[in-house]
Amino acid sequence: LSAENSKSEVYALNEQGNLQATDDLEELILRGKEIYQETDGLFDDTIYPVMKLWGFPTGNYHVPTAAEVQKKLALVDGNKVEIQTRDSDEKGRDSKEKANFVTLGADQQIDFGGIAKGYTGQKLAELFQEYGVSSALVSLGGNIQAIGTKPDGSSWKVGIRDPKGGQQDYIGVLSVESQAVVTSGGYERYFEEDGETYIHIINPRTGYPADGDLLSVTIV
């Protein structure tokens, strides 16, 4: 699901512009399109060309010109991502006989960095439970997935990092059972140039890092 891993499905889709998709990729694309609609375009997984322009995927940071931003921003449009699912087979063939086919708009590229960890956490929780695991805590960076409770029946404790502090500085601790805790903020990935700080959370309407008062957001 990584846009940077040359062996991933997403990488192949970005290179080719279309792809016969697995169920995982299909589910992510459909969910991404739902969130795109729900947020009126503030979440848009076709933002990848703009992310690359700023250098966030590679670490080769660069403050682009306004013209460069506008050129890449013209490619960002979640409505142009099309997917033909098994259910849309006009001939009514059995689902096993028809694969899903994904097509991007011209020169578009996608990045599931905003939802892939949460999706992976959910799938891991489902897999563990299928194998009888009733107590576990899955950590995927800023995404924590709790399965059940601790073996002693008590709640899991998940620390929320202080965005103004270090790695071990916390602003609070949450008690969770069979829940996911997701935290994101610009304090983890950013660069500075000419006295300005540029975070990795890009506004798909402007092509520039999001500018606001929120340092960190946690969703349970």
Enumerate the predicted regions with their spans.
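Mature catalytic core of soluble alpha/beta enzymes
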Residues: L1-V220
